Amino acid sequence: MEYLYEKLTAYGNSDYYAFHMPGHKRNMELMRARLPYNIDITEIDGFDDLHHAEGLLRELQENAAKVFHAEETHYLVNGSTVGLLSAVMGCTERGGRILMARNCHKSVYNAVYMNELRPVYIYPEFSEETDLNGEIHVDQIKKLLKEYEDIQAVVIVSPTYEGVVSDIEAIAEIVHGYKIPLIVDEAHGAHFGFHSYFPQNANTRGADVVIHSLHKTLPSLTQTALLHINGRYADRERIRNYLHMLQSSSPSYILMASIDECVRAMDECREEIMDTYVECLQQARERLKQLRNIKLIEAEHYDRSKIVLSVKNLKNTDGEVLNGKRFQEMLRSYHLEMEMASGSYVIAMTGPGDTQEGMDRLVQAVMEIDKNILCEELSGKDEDHTIKNISYEMIPLEQAYSSFEAGRMEGESVKWNEASGRISLEYVYLYPPGIPMIVPGERITSTIVQKMVKYKEMGFSIEGLSQENCLLVAGNPE
């Protein structure tokens, strides 16, 4: 079988001269940066066209489908974002209704806006003990599908940013009873199915459309992803059409070569790669379970590649109440950069590229920090500074208008403390993970404003706002 990276390398070393894009012309002496100009080409003879794949790229995508246990697979060079946009818009009619998990990524909300959809939200259960939003239960979906008979598709996130996994097989069975597709955002689970230590790939559990971000948990360059289609309920032709419209018309051959090499590694070397990784990960997790105060969070249905460490209700020996942001800063002093900090925890994202040395550094740093922590009941004064009441729980808000309707309304900017009761005309995200706290068209509550204020005070990044410390709301108070 021919592989893209090898073919690009051979072409780059040949005497073919480029009278075509890109403008660097593979001239390695032109620029000081040692970037891979030599293999950066456009759609020339012999290298196929991603938007009309008939040769090499068609064969490679078919091989990716085989490796990831899908019926049909597409390379994505615009990340999972373009896959989610294409899947949602391809599986729904304009103005239709969609059932979606409230913790979906913002790209799903953008698809809802672009297709003028009417969303029905499924709110994941929230754990007071861990401050994690949990799985989506099949009973929730069953109830809402029965209540809203015009739902055209269901979208859920599994695993979540924190690694929580839902029962895809049971959910798919219910959804298919209504002859509609189940779209699974498995962006954080591209490694699923390649080792028994991790959950199964959603392609094997009945999902109709699955999106994998290769770059998140497998050895591939940033922005690389896959979209898989299975079964008979997803409209394949419409999904393909949206991919052609929304994905770059100049797909990077460097990124596609990265996808090819990643798929090839998972096909030919998965046991060697994954066994080494899992052994290293298991050892780290076992050592972290011995912590006295900091807690390694685990759940019943969980992706163990995510190391979630909680400092909930903890103080250091100086009496400082800890939170996820402060814990992240402490780890940064050890030159360890976490994936994300939330109210009471941090996430250390692991993958096959991790080394024993890297894992040892993490464990040693956390153990040292743990020695300088007190585990005691926080006083009322302490609770003014803790995140107990501002954990990232999905708070239901009234949908006064659709996001599309809100996007066409006249608005005004008001201070946060003046926004309660008004209709928001913009998104409010805590980033990461990029899940909206407020969606355009929703009525703002004092509770959500309080959460925003406290997160801001603690140094978290609140995004989506057109003006700092203000919210764009509908012009006429209701």
Where do the model's predicted regions map?
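N-terminal glycine-rich, Lys/His-bearing helix-loop that initiates the first secondary-structure elements
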Residues: 1-38, 429, 433-436, 465-466, ...
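Conserved PLP-enzyme active-site core in the AAT-like
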Residues: 4-9, 31, 67-70, 80-298, ...
